[in-house]
């Protein structure tokens, strides 16, 4: 029996400095050994395995580091796994006893750590834990050190968690007293541990009310401390406290006894009961939530951190419930949180924070984690009924916070549940519009965003809603303008803001859903906006400003639609901007303040529109437009700087008709100027070098000029409600951003520094963000600073050196002056802003690869030195990276910066300075890399090694981070650095300075193990080792071990584990699946289904996906563990996650063939087919994969479907849609391969059709779409499959009714245009399959198509009123209908009744087809593309069509239309040209995009060229092919059909066109499938044969290529290009023709393709002049020989290959020159060698037969030019007759070949020797009995011999008869069959009829026997 071994003896020989590493490695091995022992072995050797661990703690405790302590605990856990509870209890008692009365704190810590970890793992299995509780309690006293108390309290919390109910009251009191004393500690570690204990005690509800009240006050007190980990713990405790108070309250109410602190003191016996009542779960939850909400609004929660902690507590309370419980109690949650909100009109931060928190809870917590598809709709209904509608009735009862929250939550739910419109949505729309009309300014953004989300989901009311809002806005302005001038109107800003923003927002929805509106609605927007701005000049100030604001904002929405809308209005827009952004008026200083404010307000609104124009119309920026915009912006900048601030009262007053005060608007104006300049700088070829603008940015950044006008810092913070008081005034937002290497924590979400200030940015509502949230808008002051920094970084690169120097000097002076001042906050803001600016422009310099002058570098170093003095860890990464950029850009002296930094780092005594500099060293090494000399590199490496063990935490961590980032650069110069680097990393992990428990013994207050730092180091190391890990198994295994331990440490410390996951990801990239990877796999998949930790879940999904891509073994292991079920569940919770979909697709692609049953059943179930058979894979796989119980239960559930989570819910429509997509893919790919899985799909056809029917009849748009796509796939792939039970019946025949009904469902009133269009095309394809045999069977579908055609034609009166053909959808559906009818014409070739059905409409259809195809060509390829068109005009018919809509449907329909026109062109060309020459096209709306003056009657090839060019250009744009099946194949057929000699002559063989055609064909021949390749070959052949110089080429007589005429030579060159395409096509399939002879596809289509190519090659070769043709013949012969090596091809297409050889030989014989004869002899010789080599090789039988038949063909077809005296011919004949002796299988073939050769060659005198040899050899072998089947041979030989008489010259016929008749007479006796004898008789009679005398004389000379035989044959023939 193998036992685990932990050798401690060798530690005595190990030096102390190495003992830590040795112990750790030994424990790693020991843990593996323990894990591999079975349960019985571990139980029998329990004490034996335990003793070494006890000894290790006792003897070598001082060498046990923090990670070792955790590893030691894991050893105990592995030892105890699976053992009974009493064994585990007994073992743990050993550790308790081992430190009895011990004073050594190190040993105590080690034992406490082991016990804590073991109780965490096995606490639920150990019944009696009082001993452990008292043990931990003993070491929790406040008289002990922080380290001991922290671990002891952690252990105590584990015990309390599992055994609190069985612990007596006295002990609980003592524990609580101890906890209270520890709660007042100054150590964060101890405080967190004490809070964990308190949390579990509170869960037992065994504390008195007075204690609960004390604890609440304590929590409020501590919540003001700025520590995110502490906040999380406080939040959990608040949640537990509220639950305990709720239980107390419920119990007191049930007992009808008031519960007060005084009563508690007097009735302790009553309170201290040993049993706990069970309370109603809902009631307890309701009370607890109410308590938390009351605490949130209480006076104690006066800090933002206190409120954030309470929000976290509410969130924790939710997370502790079941998801279904929270959704069921959604009404209660709404009532408690929202309906009890107080009315607040304050603009303070806490008020905004309260709004933020409510929205966070409802949208981000409840909405994203607890609501499924059904409860989401219920949630909308509850919010509507309990918040929005009541608010509409009485605004005093519902707070605006509640309304905003309800709207934000509803918008979020709508964005996820899009796809189906319900009656509830209509009710919601009406309510929202009514709230809008209330004119509440504070609700404007939420209302606008909700309307946008709602109308995106339910687009049908878009048009009426837009018109209603326009009418209301016009009415409001009319009312405003109608007031008398003497009456000062009181402007309701809210109604105008609401209407304006809502219109802007809804227009975005209209642009995204253009089929539901008329194009004229967009023109209405522009014209209305233009009128408002123009007419404002005639109004009073208030009304004018209201109109200006609305006009510019609506124009901002208009220009955001892009160039297709903006281009034609650009001139008017530029005039508007010129007027609004004019030069600074000369009398600006004499203007009153109101006039100045009005001017500034006008400029601000115009700038917002300009910014929108810059963002969405970059393509329109010509040099002239750029110049104008720069002038506009410079005017605004000068205006901003032209006046100074005046009276305090004036600058803080709100500006009329605006949302801002003067100070706010001033900041926003400058911010917009910066934003516009920055957008301008991003244009290609644009550089800004305006020094005045640069100085303005510097003033804003380094002098904080934006704060001018504010008296105090407090006033700055309080001026806006969107910035936290924690934020330093004037500092950039990047200062508070999360570092790149860290992930945002939960508290970062709850306690933001900034809140979205959407009211300051009207552009936010037109953002094209895919997020459901209203886009984040930073507060105005913050936005100004950020924009200034961004613009400065972009501009500084383009400045001359002198300007750079002066600017840097200003910055240096600014930082230096503030350094010695007392304004610390201002100093910090300026230094941070300056640093971010430096970092930004250095990054820009780096991207541009520009060097820096010496003076600039020295100033930069001086500035960075000043910034280094700022003691803030947040700035360290930016400073160090700035140094790296600087070193890289200072290329004249690349190492001078590094040398300076190394020297300063070594000499500096300031820890912060050392940390910055050492990290800078790492980044410089990474950036400069090989540019650093080796000596400097070694110095830097040695310095890093020293600093990696520094006693200062900050320095050490920065140094280790520097080591990790520079590891790659160092290793390239010093490869030996990587040797044993894993051990070096381990040594850093085991440093005494990293042992947080021991460090806490030294009274340090707060320490946490930096597991993320070491994980990052390990990840860098793995990437550097790379493929070497495959060969170095020890290093790879050790890396796996370190990753596993770091994962455990990250879980313990709560660190971000992304880097640990990345370690695993990269390990699996370079190494095979580790045997001990189960823990990591379970960890990943547990995170994936855990919605309570969304960020960790997101990371886990990404890492899992990357590993699956890189490691197939890992992927297979996960799939066998049934993790696809988990992924489906996880996908249903976040259905838009692309990575989850990709994971499923990977598995579907890999296992759809081997596991087709499971996949089909799961996919069918997901799409709603519930009664499918079991979809579970065999449980035997679980046994084979050694899955533990936890993994199987996690992924697999039980074996019964009823208990499997996968089968217990209704899935979201997004999940169903993706499942339908997967099912469609599965069907298409499986049926294409026609393998065994296809038979299974055939057996499930009824379920597949039912799934398609269920989806296509759904009320959800996307499910309808998925259903029709699935139905189309089924029709396409199963239409040719016959029913297995009835061979003459199609498989789909029985489903005709279901399929037809699905089409009918698309035409209901609420169907969308897209669905109608899709159903029309699929219906036409269904008819085209021929499944509907008669017109009566197809009547239902044909009627639908006919109705659609009649409704869509423009000449039909009243088509506008059709329920589907209205607004712009009428054009969309018209093209879709034409496409469907075009498909009918294409299918009419196979479906007879369609010809008659089409005949009555064919002319009308043809004209519309031509219009549509011409319109498509103009839009897609014309000189003016879509971006050139105006999508919305108002005056002409031409401009009433939105080209985006047309192009969208054209791209899905044009190919069908092109096919139909091609068919008509070939069958009834006069019809097409008659239409083209008539006036039928002139009045059509579709044809407005195509105007020409071509006379098609006289230039008929022109329309061919039109069709050809449309197809050709479409092949160059992949997007035009996506909507079709086999698009390239169909296009090539069209191009081949329309190809004429005239088209080739005038167009295709043009010098400019031909190369493009060839390039495209080369690309396609390499990438398309075999069928498409074949169509390309046919096209190439036809193109070659249509060469204009065809006749001149073939009959060109020349001895040299160089002597050809130029036209002929040019044509030869072009033809060679086509021949190259054919050769390339052959190389794709024939391995022997390419340098890499890899195997190619061997299916029948591929074989047919080779034959087609070879035949085309021969046909094209025959066009060339003779001198070239011969070379091509040689090439063809070589190709033929290579093809013969392909056994599979010969098996499929041998006869076709021989036919091709026949064609080649015939052509060569026809040419009849010496070279051709030589080539034929060479070929014959090669064939003979092949025949001899393969004659005994059974594997090459096909090749042998082909070679034999080829030689026969050569001797047969080339006989006129061959000489039979050649030795090679004689050798072949010998082989032929040799085969007659033994080849029984091929005897008949060989015999026929002999007779054929004899007959054919008898015609040619040069081959007479061959005939003589055949006769001689035949007679000899027959006489000797050597022929295997002599009777059969004679039956063929004698008639052939007698037939030769006809071809024998007259002078030799007598001698021939003298030979042939005796031979016939002698051997005819062997002929047994009467028919054969009769045939011989016929031949003899024919001879006797020609030469009777000679024949009779010869017969008389025969022997009696021979004579008798001849007579019998003749008599038999006569009879």
Curated annotation (Swiss-Prot):
Keywords tagged on the record: Cytoplasm, Cytoplasmic vesicle, Endocytosis, Golgi apparatus, Nucleus, Phosphoprotein, Repeat
Presence of the UniProt keyword Metal-binding in the record: no
Main location per the UniProt record: cytoplasm
Sequence positions bearing Phosphothreonine: 48
GO CC terms, sorted: cytosol; endocytic vesicle; Golgi apparatus; nucleus
Name of this chain's protein: Pof6 interactor protein 1
Region Disordered, residue ranges: 256-278
Oligomer status and interactors: Forms a complex with pof6 and skp1.
């Amino acid at each position: 029996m193998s036992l685990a071994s932990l050798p401690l003896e060798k530690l005595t020989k190990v030096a102390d400095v190495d003992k830590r590493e040795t112990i750790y490695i030994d424990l790693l091995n020991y843990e593996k050994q323990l894990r591999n022992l079975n349960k019985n072995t571990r139980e029998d050797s329990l004490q034996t395995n335990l003793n070494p661990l006890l000894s290790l703690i006792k003897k070598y405790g001082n060498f046990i580091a923090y990670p070792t302590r955790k590893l030691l605990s894991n050893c105990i856990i592995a030892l105890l796994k699976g053992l009974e509870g009493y064994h585990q209890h007994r073992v743990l008692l050993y550790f308790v006893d081992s430190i009895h009365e011990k004073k050594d704190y190190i040993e105590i810590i080690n034992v406490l750590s082991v016990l804590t970890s073991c109780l965490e793992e096995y606490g639920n299995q150990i019944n009696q834990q009082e001993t452990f509780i008292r043990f931990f309690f003993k070491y929790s006293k406040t008289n002990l050190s922080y380290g001991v108390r922290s671990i002891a309290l952690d252990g105590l919390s584990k015990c309390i968690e599992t055994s609190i109910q069985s612990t007596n009251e006295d002990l609980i009191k003592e524990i609580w007293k101890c906890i209270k004393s520890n709660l007042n500690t100054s150590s964060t570690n101890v405080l967190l541990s004490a809070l964990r204990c308190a949390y579990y005690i509170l869960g037992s509800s065994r504390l008195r009310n007075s204690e609960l009240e004390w604890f609440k006050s304590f929590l409020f007190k501590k919540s003001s401390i700025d520590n995110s980990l502490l906040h999380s713990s406080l939040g959990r405790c608040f949640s537990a406290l509220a639950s305990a108070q709720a239980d107390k309250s419920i119990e007191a109410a049930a007992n009808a006894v008031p519960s007060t602190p005084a009563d508690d003191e007097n009735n302790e016996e009553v309170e201290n009961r040993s049993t706990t009542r069970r309370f109603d779960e809902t009631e307890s939850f309701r009370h607890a939530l109410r308590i938390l909400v009351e605490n949130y609004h209480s006076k104690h929660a006066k800090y933002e951190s206190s409120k954030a902690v309470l929000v976290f507590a509410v969130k924790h309370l939710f997370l502790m419930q079941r998801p279904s419980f929270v959704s069921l109690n959604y009404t209660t949650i709404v009532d408690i949180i929202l309906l009890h909100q107080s009315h607040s009109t304050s603009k303070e931060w806490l008020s905004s924070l309260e709004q933020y928190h409510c929205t966070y809870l409802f949208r981000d917590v409840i909405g994203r984690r607890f609501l499924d598809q059904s409860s989401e709709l219920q949630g909308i209904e509850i919010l509507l009924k309990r918040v929005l509608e009541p608010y509409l009735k009485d605004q005093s009862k519902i707070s605006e916070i509640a309304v905003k929250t309800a709207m934000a939550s509803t918008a979020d739910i709508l964005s996820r549940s899009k796809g189906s419109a319900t009656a509830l949505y209509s009710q919601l729309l009406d309510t929202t519009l009514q709230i809008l009309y209330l004119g509440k300014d504070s609700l404007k953004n939420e209302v606008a965003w909700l309307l946008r989300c709602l109308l995106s989901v339910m687009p049908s009311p878009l048009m009426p809603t837009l018109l209603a809002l326009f009418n209301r806005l016009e009415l409001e302005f009319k009312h405003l303008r109608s007031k008398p001038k003497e009456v000062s109107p009181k402007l309701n800003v809210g109604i105008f803001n609401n209407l304006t923003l809502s219109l802007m927002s809804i227009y975005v929805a209209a642009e995204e859903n253009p089929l539901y509106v008329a194009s004229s609605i967009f023109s209405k927007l522009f014209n209305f906006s233009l009128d408002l701005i123009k007419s404002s000049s005639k109004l009073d100030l208030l009304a004018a400003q209201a109109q200006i604001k609305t006009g510019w904002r609506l124009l901002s929405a208009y220009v955001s639609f892009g160039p297709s809308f903006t281009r034609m209005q650009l001139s008017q827009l530029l005039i508007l901007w010129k007027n609004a952004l004019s030069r600074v008026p000369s009398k600006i200083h004499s203007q009153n303040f109101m006039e100045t404010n009005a001017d500034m307000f006008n400029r601000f609104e115009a700038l917002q529109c300009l910014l929108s124009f810059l963002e969405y119309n970059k393509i329109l920026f010509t040099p002239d437009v750029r110049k104008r915009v720069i002038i506009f912006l410079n005017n605004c900048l000068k205006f901003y700087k032209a006046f100074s601030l005046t009276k305090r009262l004036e600058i803080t007053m709100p500006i009329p008709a605006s949302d801002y005060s003067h100070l706010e608007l001033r900041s926003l104006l400058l911010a917009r100027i910066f934003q516009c300049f920055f957008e301008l700088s991003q244009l290609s070829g644009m550089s800004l070098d305006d020094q005045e603008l640069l100085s303005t940015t510097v003033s804003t950044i380094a002098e904080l000029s934006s704060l001018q006008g504010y008296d105090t810092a407090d006033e700055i913070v309080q001026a806006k409600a969107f910035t936290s008081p924690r934020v330093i005034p004037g500092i950039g937002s990047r200062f508070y951003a999360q570092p790149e290497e860290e992930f945002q924590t939960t508290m970062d979400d709850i306690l933001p520094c900034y809140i979205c200030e959407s009211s300051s940015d009207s552009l936010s509502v037109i953002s094209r963000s895919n997020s459901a949230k209203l886009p984040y808008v930073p507060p105005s002051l913050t936005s100004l600073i950020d924009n200034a920094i961004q613009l400065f970084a972009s501009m500084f690169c383009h400045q001359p050196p002198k300007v750079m120097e002066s600017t840097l000097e200003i910055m240096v002076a600014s930082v230096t002056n503030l350094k010695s001042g007392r304004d610390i906050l201002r100093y910090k803001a300026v230094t941070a802003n300056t640093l971010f600016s430096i970092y930004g422009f250095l990054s820009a310099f780096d991207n541009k690869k520009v060097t820096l002058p010496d003076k600039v570098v020295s100033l930069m170093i001086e500035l960075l030195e000043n910034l280094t003095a700022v003691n803030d860890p947040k700035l360290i990464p930016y400073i160090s990276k700035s140094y790296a950029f600087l070193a890289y850009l200072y290329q004249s002296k690349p190492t001078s910066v590094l040398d300076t930094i190394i020297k300063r780092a070594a000499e500096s005594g300031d820890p912060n300075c050392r940390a910055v500099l050492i990290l800078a060293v790492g980044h410089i090494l990474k950036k400069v890399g090989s540019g650093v000399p080796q000596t400097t590199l070694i110095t830097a490496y040695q310095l890093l090694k020293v600093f990696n063990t520094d006693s200062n935490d900050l320095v050490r961590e920065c140094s280790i981070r520097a080591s990790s980032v520079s590891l790659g650069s160092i290793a390239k110069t010093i490869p030996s650095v990587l040797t044993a680097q894993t051990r070096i990393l381990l040594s850093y992990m085991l440093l005494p300075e990293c042992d947080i428990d021991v460090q806490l013994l030294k009274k340090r207050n707060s320490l946490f193990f930096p597991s993320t730092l070491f994980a990052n180091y390990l990840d860098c190391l793995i990437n550097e080792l790379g493929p070497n890990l495959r060969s170095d198994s020890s290093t790879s295994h050790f890396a796996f071990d370190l990753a596993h331990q770091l994962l455990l440490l990250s879980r313990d410390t709560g660190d971000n584990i992304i880097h640990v996951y990345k370690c695993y990801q990269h390990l699996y990239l370079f190494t095979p699946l580790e045997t001990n990877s189960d823990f990591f796999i379970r960890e990943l998949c547990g995170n994936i289904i855990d919605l309570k930790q969304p960020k960790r879940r997101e990371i886990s999904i990404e890492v899992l996906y990357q590993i699956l891509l890189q490691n197939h073994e890992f992927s297979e292991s996960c799939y066998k563990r049934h993790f696809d079920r988990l992924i489906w569940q996880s996908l249903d919770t976040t259905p838009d996650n692309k990575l989850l979909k990709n994971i499923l697709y990977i598995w579907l692609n890999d296992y759809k063939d081997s596991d087709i049953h499971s996949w089909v059943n799961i996919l069918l179930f997901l799409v709603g087919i519930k009664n499918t058979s079991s979809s579970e894979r065999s449980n035997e796989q679980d046994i084979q994969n050694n899955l533990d119980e936890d993994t199987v239960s996690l992924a697999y559930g039980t074996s019964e479907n009823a208990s499997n989570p996968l089968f217990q819910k209704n899935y979201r429509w997004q999940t169903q849609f993706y499942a339908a997509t997967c099912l469609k893919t599965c069907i298409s790919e499986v049926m294409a391969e026609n393998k065994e899985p296809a038979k299974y799909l055939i057996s499930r056809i009824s379920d597949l059709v039912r799934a398609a029917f269920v989806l296509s009849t759904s009320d959800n748009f996307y499910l309808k779409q998925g259903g029709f796509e699935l139905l189309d796939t089924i029709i396409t792939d199963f239409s040719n499959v016959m029913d297995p039970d009835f061979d003459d019946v199609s498989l789909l025949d029985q489903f005709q009714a279901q399929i037809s009904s699905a089409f009918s469902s698309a035409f209901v009133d609420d169907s969308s245009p897209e669905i109608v269009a899709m159903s029309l095309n699929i219906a036409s394809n269904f008819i085209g399959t021929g499944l509907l045999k008669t017109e009566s069977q197809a009547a239902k579908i044909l009627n639908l198509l006919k109705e659609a055609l009649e409704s869509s034609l423009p000449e039909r009166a009243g088509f506008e009123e059709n329920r589907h053909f209205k607004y712009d959808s009428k054009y969309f559906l018209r093209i879709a209908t034409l496409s469907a009818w075009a498909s009918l014409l294409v299918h009419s070739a196979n479906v007879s009744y369609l010809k008659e059905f089409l005949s009555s409409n064919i002319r009308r259809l043809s004209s519309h087809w031509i219009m549509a195809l011409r319109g498509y060509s103009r839009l897609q390829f014309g000189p003016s593309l879509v971006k050139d068109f105006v999508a919305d005009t108002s005056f002409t018919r031409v401009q009433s069509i939105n080209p985006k809509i047309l192009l969208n449907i054209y791209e899905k329909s044009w190919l069908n239309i092109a096919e139909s026109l091609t068919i008509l062109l070939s069958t009834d060309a006069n019809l097409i040209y008659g239409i083209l020459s008539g006036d039928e096209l002139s009045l059509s709306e579709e044809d407005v995009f195509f105007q020409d003056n071509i006379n098609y009657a006289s230039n008929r090839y022109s329309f061919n060229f039109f069709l050809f060019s449309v197809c050709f250009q479409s092949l160059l744009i992949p997007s035009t092919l996506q909507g079709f099946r086999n698009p390239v194949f169909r296009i090539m057929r069209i191009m081949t059909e329309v190809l004429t000699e005239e088209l080739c002559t005038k167009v295709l063989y043009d010098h400019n066109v031909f190369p493009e055609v060839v390039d495209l064909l080369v690309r396609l021949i390499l990438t398309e499938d075999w069928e498409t390749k074949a169509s390309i070959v046919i096209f190439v052949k036809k193109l070659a044969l249509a060469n204009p110089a065809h006749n001149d080429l073939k009959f060109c007589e020349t001895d040299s290529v160089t002597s050809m005429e130029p036209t002929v030579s040019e044509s030869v060159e072009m033809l060679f290009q086509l021949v190259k395409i054919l050769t390339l096509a052959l190389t794709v399939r024939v391995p022997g023709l390419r340098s890499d002879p890899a195997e190619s596809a061997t299916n029948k289509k591929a074989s047919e393709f080779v034959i087609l190519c070879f035949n085309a090659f021969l046909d094209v070769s025959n066009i060339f002049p003779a001198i070239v043709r011969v070379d091509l013949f040689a090439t063809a012969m070589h190709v033929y020989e290579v093809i013969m090596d392909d056994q599979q091809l010969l098996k499929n297409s041998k006869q076709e290959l021989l036919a091709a050889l026949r064609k080649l030989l015939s052509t060569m014989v026809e040419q009849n020159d010496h070279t051709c004869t030589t080539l034929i002899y060479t070929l014959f010789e090669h064939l003979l060698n092949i025949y001899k080599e393969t004659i005994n090789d059974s594997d090459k039988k096909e090749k042998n037969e082909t070679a034999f038949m080829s030689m026969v063909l050569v001797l047969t077809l080339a006989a006129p030019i061959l000489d039979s005296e050649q030795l090679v011919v004689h050798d072949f004949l010998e082989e032929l007759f040799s085969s007659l002796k033994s080849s029984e299988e091929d005897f008949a073939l060989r015999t026929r070949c002999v007779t054929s050769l004899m007959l054919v060659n008898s015609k040619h005198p040069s081959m007479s020797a061959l005939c003589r040899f055949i006769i001689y050899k035949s007679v000899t072998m027959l006489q000797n009995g050597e022929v295997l089947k002599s009777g059969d041979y004679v039956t063929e030989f004698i008639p052939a011999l007698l037939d030769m008489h006809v071809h024998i010259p007259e002078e030799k016929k007598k001698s021939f008869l003298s030979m042939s008749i005796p031979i016939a007479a002698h051997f005819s006796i062997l002929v047994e069959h009467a028919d054969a004898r009769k045939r011989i008789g016929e031949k003899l009679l024919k001879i006797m009829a020609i030469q009777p005398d000679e024949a009779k004389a010869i017969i008389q000379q025969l022997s009696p026997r021979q004579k008798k035989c001849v007579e019998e044959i003749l008599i038999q023939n006569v009879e």
